[in-house]
């Protein structure tokens, strides 16, 4: 049986495919353009850190704390935007990246930095909106060609441009949320980490999602 498994792994590698990681957190980038909501970009985090720990299943976006004409006039207070499952199901998953633990930690630090009350929580429609938030996350996981000045108010177009410019670095998804979510299995259970605290800064070995402020959509 073991020789057969080795052969399957070798064939997958020769064909340019990587076998699924046993434990890693995947970041998936999403856009939402349907219904009565404003266009929006956000990302989900799903999986288990390589170093061990509790399963991660969370999502983060960035938006104005309140929607008003003041958005058009200048900076306003911003907040993290945590989408409900129904909102995610009505969105579009564009692409994903399997992160290292260091990248995962950096993304959590980004989320914390943009949390309500922090210096980066100021929302500016022109240069500090939801697209800029996912842009920074994409930068932290090693993607390039992220500066797309004409697309920074167009979440779907922006993410599709990033996908096209990062072939080989990302896993294309391009599926409607409901279908994509249905294709996912359960988040892998933590392996041995429940018996030992994580050694990676910023990763908490509990059953809770990452400890950052949340605001339900």
Which residues make up each language-model segment?
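Positively charged n-region of N-terminal signal peptides that target proteins for export
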Residues: 1-6
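Bacterial N-terminal signal peptides
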Residues: 7-17
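Sec/Tat signal peptide C-region and signal peptidase I cleavage site
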Residues: 17-24
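Glycine-rich catalytic cores of cysteine/serine-nucleophile enzymes that process amide/ester linkages
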Residues: 24-93
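Second-shell loop/turn segments in exported
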Residues: 29-32, 90-100, 115-125
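Stable alpha-helical elements in mature extracytoplasmic
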Residues: 38-41, 91, 103-110, 126, ...
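A short, structured loop/turn motif at beta-sheet edges
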Residues: 50, 97-105
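Activation targets extended, charge/polar-rich intrinsically disordered C-terminal tails
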Residues: 113-217
């Amino acid at each position: 049986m073991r020789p057969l498994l080795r052969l399957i792994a070798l064939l997958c590698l020769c064909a340019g495919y990587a076998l699924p990681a046993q434990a890693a957190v995947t970041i998936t980038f999403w856009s939402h353009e349907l219904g009565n909501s404003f266009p929006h970009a956000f990302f989900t985090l799903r999986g288990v850190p390589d170093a061990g720990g509790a399963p991660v299943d969370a999502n983060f976006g960035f938006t104005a704390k309140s929607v008003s004409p003041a958005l058009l006039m200048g900076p306003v207070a911003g907040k993290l935007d945590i989408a409900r499952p129904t909102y995610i199901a009505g969105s579009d998953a564009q692409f994903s990246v399997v992160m290292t633990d260091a990248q995962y930690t950096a993304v959590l630090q980004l989320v914390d930095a943009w949390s309500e009350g922090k210096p980066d929580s100021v929302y500016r429609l022109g240069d500090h909106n939801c697209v800029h938030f996912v842009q920074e996350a994409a930068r932290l996981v090693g993607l390039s060609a992220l500066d797309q000045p004409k697309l920074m108010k167009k979440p779907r177009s922006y993410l599709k441009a990033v996908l096209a410019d990062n072939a080989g670095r990302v896993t294309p998804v391009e599926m409607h949320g409901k279908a994509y979510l249905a294709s996912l299995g359960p988040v892998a259970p933590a392996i041995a980490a429940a018996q030992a605290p994580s050694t990676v800064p910023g990763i908490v070995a509990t059953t809770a999602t990452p400890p950052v402020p949340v605001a339900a959509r």
